[in-house]
């Protein structure tokens, strides 16, 4: 359930600016997942010296290796700054999980001293109104669907596009996309989802980001989350 929008140039500017402004020599960087973060990972390999990365997915690890960035782990290093994208940025809240990597993305971001987001203008919104991805234990997905619908949402098990069956995350979860329409109280929805038996992690990142780098046609705008 990836969200379309934004040009490659806008994404490149956001990713490169975040690396230039946020990453210092010898830093350990949390490497998010997605098309905008891909530009940041390439910039790390090209511009930053003695930097290592903690990958949030198989894809971000592969991009890091291709870029020449040393890959480490949370067991071996503390994360100085995490750089990640978002499906939506709205008033202190991020929605993530379009790439089905939000479980690892959340705990890497939470472990970092600083968490910055890279995005294009299409991801900005005044209200949280895109479906919220929820990673679930495979056997529990019917329970999660029932509970989400009891909360007033519409829940859909995410199907894979290039194979039969559902999407399976790098951590072995299935993904249920939960549409609540416009969410007036993201904190309450986040708490309700966390309390559902079988939920591994949801894609609402409330109050976690420190800054958002938005790539535009004219340059980069840095804003509060």
UniProtKB/Swiss-Prot annotation:
Associated pathway: Carbohydrate degradation; pentose phosphate pathway; D-ribose 5-phosphate from D-ribulose 5-phosphate (non-oxidative stage): step 1/1
The molecular function terms in GO held by this entry are: ribose-5-phosphate isomerase activity
Disulfide bridge positions per record: none
For the ligand (substrate), the binding residues are 33-36, 84-87, 96-99, 123
Catalytic reactions on record = aldehydo-D-ribose 5-phosphate = D-ribulose 5-phosphate
Signal sequence residues: none
Q: Do the record's keywords include Protein biosynthesis?
A: no
EC number per UniProt: 5.3.1.6
Q: Which InterPro entries match?
A: NagB/RpiA_transferase-like (IPR037171), Ribose5P_isomerase_typA_subgr (IPR020672), Ribose5P_isomerase_type_A (IPR004788)
* GO BP terms, alphabetized: D-ribose metabolic process; pentose-phosphate shunt, non-oxidative branch
Question: What does this protein do, in the record's words?
Answer: Catalyzes the reversible conversion of ribose-5-phosphate to ribulose 5-phosphate.
Listed under subunit, the entry gives:
Homodimer.
Record family assignment? Belongs to the ribose 5-phosphate isomerase family.
> Which protein are we looking at?
Ribose-5-phosphate isomerase A
State the organism named in the record.
Halobacterium salinarum (strain ATCC 700922 / JCM 11081 / NRC-1) (Halobacterium halobium)
At the highest ranks, the source species' classification is:
Archaea, Methanobacteriati, Methanobacteriota, Stenosarchaea group, Halobacteria
